[in-house]
């Protein structure tokens, strides 16, 4: 480490600390009102739908109305013609204090997810639904704005981080959890864009601009949008697929290259553009991969890959057994950074979750922190 820090000291543009690339949940929560307050401020009713339950209540107000079925739910819009009409007037409760949620225009949200995504639709006709769906009544433009947010990655990501029960005890969000998500107050310009985008998606099903719009509404930085995507791609996929998750997939050369590109971009922003160590990956047959940064050699612009060295394979296999720990049938595999005289070695399992964008950000920040500590 001393030789490395002497090399690092040559860079004039170094600064004292690196900004941690994390999704600032506290800032998000303090910047915008919760959905609950947002709805209250705009005079919008919200509640879960009716419950059949014990059927002790007879109510004729829903006779002949279309019923939205959670099992046949579609995002953004559902034509009235595809729904069955209600012919049963017995209930346990009918959300009597919030009957406007069944009147058009209204937003209906499915509280359970489909492959990590939540769905909401805005309907321009009266319809009823049961307590597995959440209804919101209010001004139509606001409903379409909220519909875009609920259908977006940001909505799923927020609840992935904050929900007490989703993917732990149950597959659905509780209404109370849904109401905690921060909602930015839209300007007239944002509302116009939201309506335009909603109508575009409703008409042709093209959702390619959805997440970019919502990222912009929440003023997320580029790296935050990547963190959101990584979390849903890897964390949710792990909950869903378990051992078959892409999180455990062997990284491709492209994955390693993308990791290295992000990793070096962050380090150069911290240490200066003159920080150009020679870099190489060892990706043989062992369960571990190694990124080697040779501080004393300048990068010739090429990222090298090696995959066949018997002594290295033997060493990595032994190291893997030392880094793998079993506790109560849970396997823990540790990551290692080794600081040699002239080189830095980053040793991690050969699984995609350790070589994605989020990992590159975290590794670069931790490496920078180690260097700063060594500098004193």
Where do the model's predicted regions map?
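Polyanion-binding catalytic cores of nucleic-acid enzymes and NTP/SAM-utilizing transferases
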Residues: 1-135, 139
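Non-catalytic DNA-recognition/assembly elements of restriction-modification systems
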Residues: 2-51, 63, 68-73, 184-376
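Conserved structured core elements
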Residues: 29, 103, 127-130, 140, ...
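Hydrophobic, well-ordered secondary-structure elements that form the walls
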Residues: 109, 152, 181, 218
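Basic, amphipathic alpha-helical recognition segments used for DNA target recognition
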Residues: 134-180, 187-190, 351-376
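Short, charged/polar micro-motifs that form catalytic or ligand-binding hotspots
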Residues: 95-99, 136-140, 168-171, 180, ...
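Short, ligand-facing micro-motifs at secondary-structure edges
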Residues: 75-80, 110-129, 144, 148, ...
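Short amphipathic alpha-helical patches
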Residues: 91, 132, 136, 169-181, ...
